[in-house]
Every structure is written in C-alpha cells, then in structure tokens.
C-alpha cells in the first residue's frame, strides 16, 4: 500500500525551512503533495500561481513531490486527494498550541486524518516566511534562507 502525505501551507514564499521539511517527508512517504493555500485573508505578497511556480521549481529535484494549490478546508482537500496524513513543521513551543488545535479540528472533520509533526533542522528552526519578507523589505540579506529562484523573485517583487 502506498502512502500519500500532504504538506500544507501558504508558502509566501517557500523557504529553505519548508524545503527541509518537504525533503524529509519525501523520504518517508511514497508521495507528498505540497499543498499551497490560497489564503486571501493573509494578503500574500505572491499570488497563488506565483507561489505554485516558485515551489514547483524549488522542489523539482524531489520526484515524488507534487505542488498543488487549494482553497477549501484541509480535511476536504485531503479527502479529495485520498490522503490521510498531514505533515506539519514545528519550529518552537509557540507553534505547538496552534498546530494541536488544527490537528484536533482536522480529526473532527476527517477522523482518519493524522498529523505528523517534523522539526526543521537547527539551521532553519527560527525562520518563517514572514520574518524573511520583513528582513528583505529592509534590505537585509535573506539569500541564505531561500532557494535561489525564490530569492530572486522576492528581490524582483520588492523593487
């Protein structure tokens, strides 16, 4: 039986921390769907199509990873994808409370949906898309935290 996992997020933009998590998930599961949420309420810097394109390029080396955009409830998306595993990254204790709430709600909506939590490697444990964008807006060098294609897209977006 093959295993399919979903790694959902806004990925605005995708960072090396996200790449770390999806790479490790790809080694654990037969297929991983990198599910990019439309998240219009978050007012993303990049459009959904841009985020899909950036993530597709950044994960091209991972043959069992597919990038898909979505706008419905995660449980509905998981059901449509015939997947019952969600991958979530945990950077710090502060992430845990929110992730626990999400996991319980997702299990309520889809009782077979399991959440698997991965901690990023130490090098990426403190970064977030929001932090990277904020530093970049103030001309800080964020190239170390982003795939090259994403870094260039961020610089272009901030011009």
UniProtKB/Swiss-Prot annotation:
Pfam families: CTP_transf_like. Its cofactor is Mg(2+). This is Phosphopantetheine adenylyltransferase. Keywords: ATP-binding, Coenzyme A biosynthesis, Cytoplasm, Magnesium, Nucleotide-binding, Nucleotidyltransferase, Transferase. Its EC number is 2.7.7.3. Homohexamer. InterPro entries: Cyt_trans-like, PPAT, Rossmann-like_a/b/a_fold. One of its GO terms (biological process) is coenzyme A biosynthetic process. It is found in: Cytoplasm. Reversibly transfers an adenylyl group from ATP to 4'-phosphopantetheine, yielding dephospho-CoA (dPCoA) and pyrophosphate. Transmembrane segments: none annotated. Belongs to the bacterial CoaD family. The record marks 18 as: Transition state stabilizer. Its main location: cytoplasm. GO terms for cellular component: cytoplasm. Pathway: Cofactor biosynthesis; coenzyme A biosynthesis; CoA from (R)-pantothenate: step 4/5. Substrate binds at residues 10, 42, 74, 88. The keyword Magnesium applies. It catalyses: (R)-4'-phosphopantetheine + ATP + H(+) = 3'-dephospho-CoA + diphosphate.
